[in-house]
């Protein structure tokens, strides 16, 4: 009779819900030509475990003004966020679950790119694909820094 109590306890314990661990998920996207300039960006969504901060944003790096000047050389660059429709019309490629430390490192990288001085955007050496690649490398992924596809985010 008393042997059934441990079995019932284990059964009950296995059926009760366990609080989900808070985490931020980084999803890497690309956006095709069409009505918009092609683009690569990272969407962050979730909850920072240590602070409880809810995160739902995205970051990409682009020229302040998309004009023929980007074909001639470096121009002013900026970090930008896109709206829900733009994201819905984009292509998610992969996602990574971030620890609080990884999230903090990624946000520091975003801040660094946001504060790059002068003409920081270059179609050939510092564009949205480079930004996404550096974010992926920062999070521990292997990247090909010699790729010929830096002008083609998809």
Model segments located where?
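Bacterial N-terminal signal peptides that target proteins for export
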Residues: 1-8
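Second-shell loop/turn segments in exported
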Residues: 28-31, 90-99, 114-122
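Residue-level marker of positions within ordered structural domains that often coincide
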Residues: 10, 46, 136-137
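Glycine-rich catalytic cores of cysteine/serine-nucleophile enzymes that process amide/ester linkages
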Residues: 22-92
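Activation targets extended, charge/polar-rich intrinsically disordered C-terminal tails
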Residues: 22-24, 55, 107-154
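C-terminal segment of classical bacterial N-terminal signal peptides
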Residues: 12-19
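Solvent-exposed, acidic/flexible segments
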Residues: 34-37, 96-106, 121-129
């Amino acid at each position: 009779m008393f042997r059934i109590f441990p079995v019932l306890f284990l059964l009950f314990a296995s059926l009760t819900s366990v609080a989900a661990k808070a985490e931020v998920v980084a999803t890497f996207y690309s956006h095709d030509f069409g009505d918009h300039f092609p683009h690569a960006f990272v969407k962050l969504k979730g909850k920072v475990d240590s602070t409880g901060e809810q995160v739902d944003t995205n970051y990409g790096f682009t020229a302040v003004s998309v004009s023929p000047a980007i074909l001639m050389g470096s121009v002013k660059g900026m970090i930008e966020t896109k709206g829900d429709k733009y994201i819905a019309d984009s292509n998610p490629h992969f996602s990574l679950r971030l620890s609080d430390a990884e999230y903090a490192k990624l946000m520091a990288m975003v801040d660094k790119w946001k504060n790059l001085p002068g003409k920081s955007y270059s179609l050939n050496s510092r564009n949205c694909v480079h930004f996404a690649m550096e974010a992926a490398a920062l999070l521990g992924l292997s990247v090909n820094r010699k790729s010929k596809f830096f002008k083609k985010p998809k």
